[in-house]
UniProtKB/Swiss-Prot annotation:
Biophysicochemical property: temperature dependence: Optimum temperature is 60 degrees Celsius.
GO MF terms, alphabetically ordered: allantoicase activity
Substrates-to-products reaction catalysed: allantoate + H2O = (S)-ureidoglycolate + urea
Keyword Hydrolase in record: yes
Protein name: Allantoicase
TM segment ranges: none
Function: Catalyzes the degradation of allantoate to (-)-ureidoglycolate and (+)-ureidoglycolate to glyoxylate.
Length: 162
């Protein structure tokens, strides 16, 4: 993977780094030392002008605050994950059909289903004798089943010939 790390397109296709805790080997993890990562630097309660009650114990708390009081979003806000159209997927500019909200429309065909076009009333009322399955329709369905799921069809040619 190190050989492709120089490629900017490969880096663009990776999910964005979620900076929890220490973001560099030299940081302690108490603060977020990379304000250029897309969110403002964490300022804490004192700089935001709000007061908090004194801790009940003398040991410092290890809870991670996932919000910044002075920002609209939290410390980590990714539009693909937290946005209004959040599917959990990263939109990739090189595969536009796989984007969460794609501008590429699904292809529409003149005949969506040729089987339904040839037999329009087959599934309307199965108890109607006019809709009973004909032999060529059954042959088409067996052909489809044999192609799609490579199993022995229910009525094979050798059994029908006996």
């Amino acid at each position: 993977m190190a050989s492709t790390s120089h490629n900017p397109f490969y880096a663009a296709m990776q999910p964005q780094a979620q900076h929890w805790g220490a973001t560099s080997p030299t940081s302690t993890g108490a603060g977020y030392d990379r304000p250029s990562a897309g969110y403002p630097a964490y300022t804490g309660y004192a700089a935001a002008g709000t007061s908090h009650p004194a801790p009940s114990s003398s040991s410092p708390s290890t809870a991670l605050a996932l919000y910044n009081p002075s920002s609209l979003y939290g410390l980590y806000y990714n539009e693909a994950v937290h946005g209004p159209f959040a599917t959990g997927l990263q939109s990739n500019p090189f595969t536009p059909g796989l984007a969460p909200l794609s501008t590429v429309s699904r292809p529409s065909y003149a005949t969506e289903d040729p089987l339904r076009q040839r037999y329009p009333a087959t599934s309307a009322n199965p108890h109607d004798p006019l809709n009973w399955i004909t032999e060529d329709l059954f042959a088409i369905r067996m052909e489809r089943a044999a192609i799609s799921q490579q199993r022995t069809p229910l009525r094979s040619a050798s059994v029908a010939a006996r």
